[in-house]
From Swiss-Prot:
It comes from Kluyveromyces lactis (strain ATCC 8585 / CBS 2359 / DSM 70799 / NBRC 1267 / NRRL Y-1140 / WM37). F-actin-capping proteins bind in a Ca(2+)-independent manner to the fast growing ends of actin filaments (barbed end) thereby blocking the exchange of subunits at these ends. Unlike other capping proteins (such as gelsolin and severin), these proteins do not sever actin filaments. The lineage of its organism: Eukaryota, Fungi, Dikarya, Ascomycota, Saccharomycotina. Transmembrane segments: none annotated. This is F-actin-capping protein subunit beta. PROSITE patterns: F_ACTIN_CAPPING_BETA (PS00231).
Length: 279
């Protein structure tokens, strides 16, 4: 098999396996076929992990493939890698340019407020990187909320910002993936719901009263903030109204319908909805 065929087969297999164990399955596939590791790591979303930034009072930050270099991850708070890389490796490690780093800091501060307001806790991290030598850039905005071991929400927003030739408009493209795991631990019967949902969105914004690089920072952070807020709101509604209701319909068909089982099913569905709304 060619490398492309192995990659396609691995992706197809991962889509059919238990989504709660995707990280384990991914590691096993990479160990089996190391040559497809880079492709799988960049295309398969796994639940976000958390590290502490010892250079920023042990403040926690989220880790994914986009802020990884070798086995270390860059913190958005101190702009350093943890665990610390060697001086030789650090020379080749990716860092945002100074103007983009300023925007990265502003976005992290803005989304911290968003997280407190809409998630009432949890974690958020934003990472940006330069695209060629232009003012265009790309990045990822991460959110993680775990109400308990049984209720987890991870949202990954991969963004790109492209300016027009005159520099008067910027087009934002956002690919969002939500990884959701809900579970009830009822003594009578256990029910879990896991999976991910991916959607793409784009928006073109006119840059008004923006003539310097410094003025671009609040313009970009404001535009991205409103766009992410709108995307997450729509995805939450879609998950709750469409997917949960459809799951309940399928569950009812598969289960034997008697008064006791119907009552139990409704209780389990209500518990899942309640856990979701807490995230």
């Amino acid at each position: 098999m060619s490398v492309d065929e192995k990659y396609d087969a691995a992706c197809e297999l991962l889509y059919r396996l238990d989504p709660t164990k995707v990280k384990t399955h991914l590691q096993n596939l990479i160990a089996l076929e190391p040559e497809i590791a880079e492709g799988l790591l960049s295309s398969i979303d796994i639940p976000l992990t958390i590290k502490k930034d010892t250079d920023a009072n042990n403040k926690e930050f989220l880790c994914c493939d986009y802020n990884r270099d070798i086995d270390s991850h860059r913190s958005p708070w101190s702009n350093q890698y943890f665990p610390e890389l060697s001086a030789e490796d650090l020379k080749e490690s990716p860092f945002p340019s100074e103007p983009l780093r300023e925007l990265e800091v502003a976005c992290n501060n803005s989304f911290e407020l968003y997280r407190d307001l809409y998630y009432e806790g949890g974690y958020t991290s934003t990472y940006l990187w330069d695209v060629d030598e232009s003012t265009d850039f790309a990045g990822v905005i991460l959110f993680k909320k775990a109400e308990s071991d049984d209720s987890k929400w991870d949202s990954i927003h991969v963004i790109s910002a492209t300016h027009d030739e005159e520099g008067m408009e910027v087009t934002y493209n956002v690919t969002t993936t939500v990884i959701l795991h809900l579970e009830n631990l009822s003594k009578e019967q256990q029910l879990s719901l896991s999976g991910n949902l991916t959607r793409e969105n784009s928006k073109t914004v006119k840059l008004q009263n923006v003539s310097t690089v410094e003025q671009l920072v609040p313009a970009h952070s404001s535009s991205l903030g409103s766009m992410i807020e709108d995307i997450e709101s729509k995805l939450r509604s879609m998950l709750e109204i469409v997917y949960f209701e459809k799951t309940l319909d399928i569950y009812n068909v598969l289960r034997e319908r008697n008064d006791d089982s119907t009552k139990l099913q409704k209780e389990q569905h209500s518990e899942l909805i309640e856990n979701f709304q807490k995230l």
